[in-house]
Regions:
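Short, small-residue-biased leader/transition segments that mark boundaries at the very start
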Residues: 1-7
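Structural motif
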Residues: 11-13
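Short glycine-rich anion-binding loops that position phosphate/pyrophosphate groups of nucleotides
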Residues: 17-21, 118
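Mid-sequence, gly/pro-rich, charge-dense loop/helix-turn segments that line enzyme active sites
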Residues: 20-86, 90
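Active-site-adjacent mobile loop/cap segments within catalytic or ligand-binding domains
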Residues: 95-146
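SAM-dependent methyltransferases
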Residues: 142, 148-163
Length: 163
């Protein structure tokens, strides 16, 4: 697009909310699958459907995911790498961005960050539902953006899940 040509974007960072998660989660992979437990905002509820028929089975984030988490933790913000963006809207957005980068903008990097509920969103939810203040979420995103700008490649550190 014209905006991409004018600004020579280097990275795309998408942000979505994952209510129930207790910290910031930086997504590592998006899969080519839509399967919604509930309808989306347009009332659509896909079942076992590929996002793109001509797309790869999955795309890995090309942002420095582990560096982003490291910067957030250094700022005392709960954060971790996530290995599933789910099969709902957030995964769909991440997948489509990485597909577009793969097909049209190979010079760009892209990825996705999930943020928790805000405290005021949990008022009518079960006691103990995780949340995070908006100021901390904003600081986490600042840390993530700084990591993207300062790190062309990711750090080599262990961050895998046991299950």
């Amino acid at each position: 697009s014209a905006a991409s040509d004018v600004y020579k974007r280097q990275a795309v960072l998408c942000v979505g909310q994952a209510g129930g998660r207790s910290g910031i989660t930086v997504e590592k992979v998006a899969i080519n699958l839509m399967e919604a437990r509930i309808p989306d905002n347009e009332g659509k509820q896909p079942l076992d459907t590929p996002i793109r028929e001509d797309g790869e089975n999955a795309y890995f984030a090309s942002l420095p995911v582990k560096s982003m988490v490291q910067y957030m933790k250094e700022a005392k913000i709960p954060a971790r790498v996530s290995y599933t963006a789910g099969t709902f809207v957030c995964n769909d957005i991440m997948y489509r961005v990485l597909y577009m980068i793969d097909k049209e903008y190979p010079h760009m990097r892209g990825g996705f960050v999930h943020v928790p509920y805000l405290p005021e969103q949990t008022l009518d939810l079960p006691e103990g539902t995780p949340s995070m203040p908006a100021e901390m979420i904003a600081k986490a995103l600042e840390c993530g953006i700084r990591a993207i700008v300062e790190n062309e490649t990711d750090v080599k550190t262990i961050s895998g899940e046991t299950h």
